[in-house]
C-alpha cells in the first residue's frame, strides 16, 4: 500500500547545503525540506523568499520533499 502524504504550501526562509531548505508552512510550522529529483533534473532554482509546495509524510512531519516552486505574482515573465 502506498504511503499517504500531505501537501502544504510554504515559504523558503533559509538555504542549506545539498539542496536542503528551511520552509515556513502557511500554519507557521518550520520544516526541513529537500528538493525532489524532478526539480533537481530540471535545474529549477529555488531561492529564499520563494513559495513552494511541499509533500510531508504522516509518519515524520518534521521533513518534507519540495515538489513544486510556485510562480511569484510580481514577476515579469
Curated annotation (Swiss-Prot):
<keyword id="KW-0396">Initiation factor</keyword>
<protein>
    <recommendedName>
        <fullName>Translation initiation factor IF-1, chloroplastic</fullName>
    </recommendedName>
</protein>
<comment type="function">
    <text>One of the essential components for the initiation of protein synthesis. Stabilizes the binding of IF-2 and IF-3 on the 30S subunit to which N-formylmethionyl-tRNA(fMet) subsequently binds. Helps modulate mRNA selection, yielding the 30S pre-initiation complex (PIC). Upon addition of the 50S ribosomal subunit IF-1, IF-2 and IF-3 are released leaving the mature 70S translation initiation complex.</text>
</comment>
<dbReference type="GO" id="GO:0003743">
    <property type="term" value="F:translation initiation factor activity"/>
</dbReference>
<dbReference type="Pfam" id="PF01176">
    <property type="entry name" value="eIF-1a"/>
</dbReference>
<feature type="domain" description="S1-like">
    <location>
        <begin position="1"/>
        <end position="71"/>
    </location>
</feature>
<dbReference type="InterPro" id="IPR012340">
    <property type="entry name" value="NA-bd_OB-fold"/>
</dbReference>
<dbReference type="GO" id="GO:0005829">
    <property type="term" value="C:cytosol"/>
</dbReference>
<dbReference type="InterPro" id="IPR006196">
    <property type="entry name" value="RNA-binding_domain_S1_IF1"/>
</dbReference>
<dbReference type="InterPro" id="IPR004368">
    <property type="entry name" value="TIF_IF1"/>
</dbReference>
<comment type="subunit">
    <text>Component of the 30S ribosomal translation pre-initiation complex which assembles on the 30S ribosome in the order IF-2 and IF-3, IF-1 and N-formylmethionyl-tRNA(fMet); mRNA recruitment can occur at any time during PIC assembly.</text>
</comment>
<keyword id="KW-0150">Chloroplast</keyword>
<keyword id="KW-0699">rRNA-binding</keyword>
<comment type="similarity">
    <text>Belongs to the IF-1 family.</text>
</comment>
<keyword id="KW-0934">Plastid</keyword>
<dbReference type="InterPro" id="IPR003029">
    <property type="entry name" value="S1_domain"/>
</dbReference>
<dbReference type="GO" id="GO:0009507">
    <property type="term" value="C:chloroplast"/>
</dbReference>
<keyword id="KW-0694">RNA-binding</keyword>
<dbReference type="GO" id="GO:0019843">
    <property type="term" value="F:rRNA binding"/>
</dbReference>
<dbReference type="GO" id="GO:0043022">
    <property type="term" value="F:ribosome binding"/>
</dbReference>
<keyword id="KW-0648">Protein biosynthesis</keyword>
Amino acid at each position: 500500500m502506498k504511503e499517504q502524504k500531505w501537501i502544504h504550501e510554504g515559504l523558503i526562509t533559509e538555504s542549506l547545503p545539498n539542496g536542503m531548505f528551511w520552509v515556513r508552512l502557511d500554519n507557521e510550522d518550520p520544516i526541513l525540506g529537500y528538493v525532489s529529483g524532478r526539480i533537481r533534473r530540471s535545474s529549477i532554482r529555488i531561492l529564499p523568499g520563494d513559495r513552494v509546495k511541499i509533500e510531508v509524510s504522516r509518519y515524520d512531519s518534521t521533513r518534507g520533499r519540495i515538489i513544486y516552486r510556485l510562480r511569484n505574482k510580481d514577476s515579469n515573465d
